[in-house]
Structures are given as structure tokens and as C-alpha cells.
């Protein structure tokens, strides 16, 4: 039996990454759909003050509108020297949603006088799974590192070109996709949802109490 799962995102690069992570997870019986595969519906605005709140709002709307189990994520960059910002505002930090170059340049400008020892940061991802019947689960993944002064690399998206993960010399944008998926905030969050996804598919390996039970 195949279970259809909706990944509720309009970001094509994020959708590719989510699909890639799920494909490598070994959960059989999932047909992964994107928003382009279902009728259009009004999507929740990202107005919650937390990553978890935004992820849940998007997944709830998607599950209610389509009748499908839905996974949504909200993620962003948390910069120590900026008091945790841009945080949930990461995608629109420079004012326009999804302008990766402007967002990245603004963060670098704000950190111009910050020394290397204080350029710590983390990528954070909240991933939410919501079933049409109303059951839901939300998990967090975090990826710590530091910010360099100039972008490097052509892979990834968002702030990847300025983020060097702990234990690495390369930026996230210099990692191969499979390398990034194995350690990234989004990879960690989705892997934390695997017991619930296995339960949705009726597969062994679901934890007691995982969705749907």
C-alpha cells in the first residue's frame, strides 16, 4: 500500500532537498507530493514567533485543504551576535521574501565589525507532520557553526554560502548534497520524524505512540 505524503513548500530547492532526505531514509511506501501536485489552496502566512509555530500552521492548512498527511518545515539562521536574529525572519530579512542574496549581504554587513571568535551561528529547522484527522507532531533539528566574511560555494541556497559547520573548513554551499543532508538541520529534523512517518505507512520501526499510533 502506498501512502501519499504532501511536502507543503513552494521553494523548489527546499522541496528537492526534502525529497532527497526522505528518499535516503529508507521509508518505503511513501509517494511524496509537492504543492504543484495538488489543487491550489490558501497557505498559512509565516507570522508565528517560533519555527515550530510556523511549521505547524503550514502543515495544518495543507492537511485540512488536501486530506493528505502533510509535512511542513520552517527554518532559518540564528546568529549569536545578532541576539538570535534573523531567526524566523530569515527568508525576508532584507525586506523581500526569498531574496537570498540580499538577505545574506545584510547579515554580513551587520557582522562587519564582529571578530571571528564571536561569529557563531546555527541553522534551525522545525519539521511538522499533521494528519487529516488532526494528530500532529513537530520536531527540531539544529546545525551549529560559524559565519565567514564572504560567500563561498555554489551548492545549497539561502545562507549556505557563509555558514561553516562545526568540524568543517568548507561552507555548507561547498558540501556535496549528500554530505549536507547527512548533517544538516533539515536532515536531522526529518530523521526525527521517521518513526511517525513509518507509523503512517504501517511499517515496522515506529516508536510506541508515534503517529498515527
Features from the language model and the residues they span:
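Anionic-ligand binding patches
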Residues: 2-6, 12-213
Amino acid at each position: 500500500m502506498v501512502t501519499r505524503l504532501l511536502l507543503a513548500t513552494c521553494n523548489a530547492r527546499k522541496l528537492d532537498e526534502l525529497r532527497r532526505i526522505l528518499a535516503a531514509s529508507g521509508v518505503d511506501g511513501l509517494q511524496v507530493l509537492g504543492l504543484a501536485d495538488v489543487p491550489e489552496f490558501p497557505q498559512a502566512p509565516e507570522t508565528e514567533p517560533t519555527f515550530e509555530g510556523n511549521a505547524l500552521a503550514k502543515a495544518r492548512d495543507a492537511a485540512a485543504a488536501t486530506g493528505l498527511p502533510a509535512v511542513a518545515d520552517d527554518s532559518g539562521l540564528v546568529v549569536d551576535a545578532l541576539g538570535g536574529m534573523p531567526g524566523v525572519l530569515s527568508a525576508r530579512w532584507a525586506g523581500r521574501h526569498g531574496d537570498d542574496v540580499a538577505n545574506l549581504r545584510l547579515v554580513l554587513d551587520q557582522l562587519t565589525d564582529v571578530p571571528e571568535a564571536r561569529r557563531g551561528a546555527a541553522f534551525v529547522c522545525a519539521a511538522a507532520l499533521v494528519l487529516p484527522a488532526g494528530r500532529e507532531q513537530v520536531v527540531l533539528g539544529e546545525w551549529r557553526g560559524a559565519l565567514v566574511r564572504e560567500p563561498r560555494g555554489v551548492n545549497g541556497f539561502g545562507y549556505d554560502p557563509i555558514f561553516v559547520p562545526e568540524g568543517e573548513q568548507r561552507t555548507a554551499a561547498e558540501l556535496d548534497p549528500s554530505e549536507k543532508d547527512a548533517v544538516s538541520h533539515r536532515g536531522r529534523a526529518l530523521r526525527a520524524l521517521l518513526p511517525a512517518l513509518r507509523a503512517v505507512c504501517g511499517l515496522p520501526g515506529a516508536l510506541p505512540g508515534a503517529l498515527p499510533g
